[in-house]
């Protein structure tokens, strides 16, 4: 499968999805569609469709945004230094879609690598396990579990 950002896909974004992914915005905490999602499946870039995170790596951090311990395909996630808002953080962007996803912090579960990928729901599209094969993501079944 080829993943890329197209003008057509960008034009389909809601105003909030555009603000978050194309203008480096952040959702208000506890407002995102996937914050409390516990269904098995994968999360892909809303623009390019590239696989980003799996339900098996999602955890409740209490921060108000979906949190994951690691990307499903590390090469699909770029990490960049972010000096905005008077802080030094690590921004997370999709590699093919160049969408702003959120940030990664070193305060995740220690027994699962110690990282917390804090991701905006507006940057994601959830593919339920039962639809993964039909949508072309069947190769990721081994990274999805009931949570």
From Swiss-Prot:
A single MF term (Gene Ontology):
peptide-methionine (R)-S-oxide reductase activity
Which UniProt keywords are given for this protein, alphabetically ordered? Oxidoreductase, Plasmid
- Its Enzyme Commission number? 1.8.4.12
Record-annotated MsrB domain positions: 6-129
| One Pfam entry name | SelR
- Does the keyword field hold Chloroplast? no
**Catalytic residues as annotated in Swiss-Prot or TrEMBL:** 118
Q: Which reaction does it catalyse?
A: L-methionyl-[protein] + [thioredoxin]-disulfide + H2O = L-methionyl-(R)-S-oxide-[protein] + [thioredoxin]-dithiol
Tell me the leader sequence span.
none
Which Gene Ontology cellular-component terms appear in the entry? cytoplasm
Q: Is the keyword Protease in the record?
A: no
Q: Which family does it belong to?
A: Belongs to the MsrB Met sulfoxide reductase family.
- The name under which this protein is listed is Peptide methionine sulfoxide reductase MsrB 2
Organism, scientific name: Rhizobium meliloti (strain 1021)
Please name the taxonomic classification of the source. Bacteria, Pseudomonadati, Pseudomonadota, Alphaproteobacteria, Hyphomicrobiales
- Gene transcribed to yield this protein: msrB2
């Amino acid at each position: 499968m080829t993943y890329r950002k197209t003008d057509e896909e960008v034009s389909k974004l809601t105003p909030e999805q555009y603000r978050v992914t194309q203008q480096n915005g952040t959702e208000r905490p506890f407002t995102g569609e996937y914050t409390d999602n516990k269904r098995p499946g994968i999360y892909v870039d809303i623009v390019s469709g590239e696989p980003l995170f799996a339900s098996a790596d999602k955890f409740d951090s209490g921060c108000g945004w979906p949190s994951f311990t690691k990307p499903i395909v590390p090469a699909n996630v770029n990490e960049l230094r972010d000096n905005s808002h008077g802080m030094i953080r690590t921004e997370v962007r999709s590699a093919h879609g160049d969408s702003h996803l959120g940030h990664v912090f070193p305060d995740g579960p220690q027994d699962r690598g110690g990282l917390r990928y804090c991701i905006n729901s507006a940057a994601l599209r959830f593919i339920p396990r039962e639809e993964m094969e039909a949508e072309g993501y069947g190769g990721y079944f081994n990274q999805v579990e009931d949570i």
